[in-house]
Curated annotation (Swiss-Prot):
Catalytic activity field: tRNA(Met) + L-methionine + ATP = L-methionyl-tRNA(Met) + AMP + diphosphate
GO molecular-function term, one example from the UniProt record: tRNA binding
Lineage: Bacteria, Pseudomonadati, Pseudomonadota, Gammaproteobacteria, Aeromonadales
Gene Ontology terms: cellular component: cytosol
Alphabetical list of InterPro entries matching this protein: aa-tRNA-synth_I_CS, Anticodon_Met, Met-tRNA-synth_bsu_C, Met-tRNA_ligase_1, Met-tRNA_synth, Methionyl/Leucyl_tRNA_Synth, MetRS_core, MetRS_Zn
Main location: cytoplasm
Cofactor(s) the protein requires to work: Zn(2+)
Quaternary context: Homodimer.
Keywords: Aminoacyl-tRNA synthetase, ATP-binding, Cytoplasm, Ligase, Metal-binding, Nucleotide-binding, Protein biosynthesis, RNA-binding, tRNA-binding, Zinc
Protein name per the record: Methionine--tRNA ligase
Chain span(s) of sequence motif 'KMSKS' region: 332-336
UniProt record, GO biological process: methionyl-tRNA aminoacylation
Length: 675
């Protein structure tokens, strides 16, 4: 039986609001959902929340590419995410967004408290700046070589190879991920969270049992090398919350992202009206707070986040449950191989409970990576769920409904066997509690094997053919369905939809604490198929569909490319016919008789050409004189009523004031050919 009711708040890491959910994300959400459903079955008061992480430069830039506002983009992504999670039966009590009034309130509150308590420092720093885009570059928009392990193509905040964290200015050979330009250094004032002040508290907390041993050991390396102040500022332009009293400065996304847990929970409290927010977040709270996260974001959750909470007068997490990555067929998820599978693609082809079961069968409480082997996935689900579990009901239910009026026996013929199944309750509960889901599944399937041995030994299909054996037939089938009920109760956190169909058939709710009493003289419903085998053809179709999605995944062009698509393909010989030359604009003057034309005198380095250009709406003559430009030098002269035009200058833009003549590098000389 379960112990006294506990008050528990569970969160999953917040998915970033600029892309789709894939099967790697889904591991964490399935893991947390199984644990939450188990706790609900045990009678505990548990709240399960999440939100979209909706701030940052990546979202701002992607929205620009799509030609929409960041608010429009994150609203659409949130709807997509929630649809995917619902499809996989993730039972959130609330799903919110970090771009919310609640999150702004708590972000400003925590920042203000940290500042008032002396934990926020201000200093002028030199930061990487994109000279082409005229913007400071956030960590994730600088890429280069890791200063620690020398791995190439790493982001500006942490290395995905060795796990080191660093400043973007420490990268070797940095490049802007926005334009590809080499960044320059530029000074700006930033605010820092003084993490070193929390070193003693964090060292004690991280070794208190609040983290897995592997994580605690890893964090010890960072304590050994010393903690550093954390830059919590980003410069405009930025999509996020402006820092109070600091115009043009914004909270770094990793400051307000974990605060999103509080924002989402406050949103739930306000909607429900019967939940006390402070009972879960105050410093003296005795409620339990658990974060399920991936191993790639341990540093933020196990150092910055508890320090922020402590410094602002809130409670720290009870535990942080860290999992590994998902590989597919023994390798990193691959777009080209079709193993980078979106949740929505999976749902178009397969039952989500198949993946829930497979993940559960392989999950433990360590941070090992989990391999989704697609052949094993098919074999295990078909063998365990269909052949072993559902088969128990399908082999015996028909006899109950057709021969025994749909009613189970009024006594249990095998009480010792039944006791074997119910006595496993606490072992399986302990496995669920400790997130040893694979151990729970092994226990359940071992019992399923025992139940099938019982059915094989008793052979109800043989008994059914014998005259006067209705009592024996009833005893065997009733025992089998009672064993099936116990097994389905144990599996309910993993496969809630299958459990719901079993409940409809058994005509009873599957409650953990009810299994001690078997179903006697109980009516069941006519049996319907409970679960379908996985067809390997559907798995292949899912992989093929993922390949096709990647081939067409490039976002639809917006802006100039969409307005004027690329012209039909030409050959190199076609291009070679064009003679493009650098030209110096010696003189420019308006053509009084024409609204759009300027008369240009172009020096080709020994020859001067007269060209009429329709750029009067964008340039005055004074702006052009002395500039280098590019002209088509071998275009046939064209006689106009103002004179002869002996070529064409090149310009870009839709027209009007938005016309831009091409200006080559200052090193180019008049007369040079462009090739």
């Amino acid at each position: 039986m379960s112990s006294a009711s506990r008050n528990i708040l569970v969160t999953c890491a917040l998915p970033y609001a600029n892309g789709s959910i894939h099967l790697g994300h889904m591991l964490e959400h399935v893991q947390a959902d199984i644990w939450v459903r188990f706790q609900r079955m045990r009678g505990h008061n548990i709240h399960f929340i999440c939100a979209d992480d909706a701030h940052g430069t990546p979202i701002m830039l992607k929205a620009q590419q799509l030609g929409i506002t960041p608010e429009e983009m994150i609203a659409a992504v949130s709807q997509e995410h929630q649809t995917d999670f619902a499809g996989f039966k993730i039972s959130f009590d609330n799903y919110h967004s970090t771009h919310s009034d609640e999150n702004r309130y708590f972000s400003e509150l925590i920042y203000t408290k940290l500042k008032d308590n002396g934990f926020i420092k201000s200093k002028t720093i030199s930061q990487l700046y994109d000279p082409e885009k005229n913007m400071f570059l956030p960590d994730r928009f600088v890429k280069g070589t890791c200063p620690k392990c020398k791995a190439v193509d790493q982001y500006g905040d942490n290395c995905e190879v060795c796990g080191a964290t660093y400043s973007p200015t420490e990268l070797i050979n940095p490049k802007s991920a926005v334009s590809g330009a080499t960044p320059v250094m530029k000074e700006t004032e930033h605010f820092f969270f003084d993490l070193p002040q929390f070193a003693d508290m964090l060292q004690a907390w991280t070794t208190s049992g609040a983290l897995q041993e592997e994580i605690s050991n890893k964090l010890n390396e960072w304590f050994t090398s010393g903690l550093h102040q954390w830059d919590i500022t980003r410069d405009a332009p930025y999509f996020g919350f402006e820092i109070p009293g600091a115009p043009g400065k914004f909270f770094y996304v990793w400051l307000d992202a974990p605060i999103g847990y509080m924002g989402s929970f406050k949103n739930l409290c306000d909607k429900r009206g019967d939940i006390d927010f402070d009972a879960f977040w105050s410093q003296n709270s005795d409620a339990e707070l658990y974060h399920f996260i991936g191993k790639d974001i341990v540093y933020f959750h196990s150092l910055f986040w508890p320090a922020m909470l402590d410094g602002a007068g809130f409670r720290k997490p009870s535990n942080i449950f860290v999992h590994g990555y998902v590989t597919v067929n023994g390798a990193k998820m691959s777009k080209s191989r079709g193993t980078f599978i979106k949740a929505s693609t999976y749902l178009q082809h397969l039952d989500p409970e198949c993946l829930r079961y497979y993940y559960a069968a392989k999950l433990n409480n360590r941070i090992d990576d989990l391999d989704l082997n697609l052949d094993d996935f098919v074999a295990r689900v078909n063998s365990d769920v269909v052949n072993k579990l559902v088969n128990l009901a399908s082999r015996t239910a028909g006899f109950i409904t057709k021969r025994l009026d749909g009613k189970l026996a009024d006594t249990l013929s095998e009480p010792a066997l039944y006791a074997t199944f119910t006595s496993a309750s606490e072992r399986i509960a302990e496995a669920y509690e400790n997130r040893e889901f694979s151990r729970a599944i092994r226990e359940i399937m071992a019992l399923a094997d025992e139940a099938n041995r019982y059915v094989d030994e008793k052979a109800p299909w043989v008994i059914a053919k014998q005259e006067g054996q209705e009592a024996e037939l009833s005893a065997v089938c009733s025992t089998t369905l009672n064993l099936f009920r116990v097994l389905m109760t144990y599996l309910k956190p993993v496969m809630p939809e299958l459990a719901a169909r079993a409940e409809a058939f058994l005509n009873v709710t599957l409650n953990w604490n009810d299994i001690e009493q078997p179903l006697l003289a109980h009516n069941v419903a006519p049996f319907k198929a409970l679960f379908n085998r996985i067809d390997p053809v559907k798995v292949t179709a899912m992989v093929d569909a993922s390949k096709e999605e990647q081939q067409t995944a490039a976002p639809k062009a917006t802006g100039p490319l969409a307005d004027e698509p690329i012209a039909p393909e030409i050959t190199y010989d076609d291009f070679a016919k064009l003679d493009l030359r650098i030209a110096l604009i010696k003189k420019a003057e308006a053509v009084p008789e024409a609204d759009k034309l300027l008369r240009l005198q172009l020096d080709l380095g020994g020859e001067v050409r007269q060209v009429f250009a329709g750029i009067k709406s964008a340039y005055s003559p004074e702006q052009l004189e002395g500039k280098l430009t590019v002209m088509v030098a071998n275009l046939a002269p064209r006689k106009m009523r103002f004179g002869m035009s002996e070529g064409m200058v090149l310009a870009a833009g839709p027209g009007g004031k938005d016309l831009f003549i091409l200006e080559p590098n200052a090193g180019a000389k008049p007369g040079m050919r462009v090739k």
